[in-house]
Amino acid sequence: MTAAPQPEDHHAAVIYNPIKVDLARLEADVAEAEAAAGWGTTQWYPTSVEDAGQSVTKTALDQGAAVVLAAGGDGTVRGVAEALRDSGVPIALIPSGTGNLLARNLELPLTDQVASIGAAFTGVDRHIDVGIAEIERADGTSEEHAFLVMAGLGLDAKMIALTNPKLKKAVGWLAYIDAGVRALPDLKPVKLRFSIDGAPERTTSVHTIIVGNCGALPGGILLMPDAKPDDGVLDIAALKPSGPFGWVKVWNKVAWENGVLRKSTLGRSIIDLTSDVKDVLYATGTDLRMTVEQPQEFQLDGDEFGEAKSVHAWVDPGALTVKVPA
C-alpha cells in the first residue's frame, strides 16, 4: 500500500561513509522506500577524513531534512548524532560498520538494510540520552564531543589505538583481542582523581575506566548490565584486576555472569549466591569528573581521541530522537 504523498519539500538526508557502504545498492533501497512513503527527493552527503558527519549533518538540517539516515560505522553514527543532539530531527541507523554499537544496544536490525531504511520513513520515534565528554589535553586545550555508547580511558582506549585496521576489516571486532594482547605487556595502573555528581574528590588506581550510556559490546559481552540508553544516568565501570588471575575474574564477570547468567532467573540466583568481584567496580551518576596523573589514551564509541589529562562527562537526557521499526 502506497503512503499518502508528503509535501514536496518533506525529504530525508543520508549521511554516508563512502568507504563503508555499497552506494549503488543504498541509493536504490532509499529511492524505493522514499517513493513508497510519498516523500520528496532524498539529499546525499558523504563523510570525509576531515568530517565524520557533524558538518554535513548541520548542512542537511539547514536544508530542512525531516530525518537523517546515518550509513556507516560507529564514528559516522556518533558524528551525525552530535549534530542532531537537541534538534528534534530524528536519526535512522543504517548499520554498515564493524561494531554497530548503538544499533546493537537498541536491538535494531544489523544486517537487513531494507528494514533499517524502512524505519527511517515509516518508523516511530524513540528518545535516548546522549553522553557528553569535555576532554582536556596536556597543553590545556579542550574540546567537547558526544558519545552514544561508551567513553573510555586507559586500557580500552589503548586497545583501540593499537588495533590493526587491516585485521579489523578482515575479522571485525575480534581485532580488538589482538590489540589487547599487545597492550597488556606494557600496561600499568592509571592513577586518577575523580568525583561523581559533585561528591568529594577521591583517588584510585585502575587499568581502565569506562563511562557508558549503553552496556553491550560485540561478542555477547555485557560490560554494564544495568545501563539503559534512556534512563537519564551514566553507568561507570572501573576495571582494576589484581594480577593475571584478576583478568580472568574480569572476563568471567563481563562475559559469563553479565552476558550469560543474567539472562535467566536461575543464573541471577547463582550470581546472588557468589561474592562480588572486586576487580570490576560499578557506579552510576549524571556527572563524572576525572583527572589522571599522566595523560592517557581516550576513546569515544570505539574511536580513538588522543590523550586526555582530564575528562568531564555528563548526560543530556532524551537529547536524541531515533527512528525505530513501528
Residue ranges and their predicted role:
Residues 53, 75-80, 99-101, 128:
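Short glycine/serine/threonine-rich phosphate/pyrophosphate-binding segments
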Residues 18, 71-73, 94-97:
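Glycine-rich beta-strand-to-loop/alpha-helix junction loops that act as flexible
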Residues 167-175, 219-220, 225-249:
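Gly/Ser/Thr-rich active-site loops/lids in small-molecule metabolic enzymes
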Residues 1-68, 78, 118:
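ATP/NTP phosphate-donor binding region
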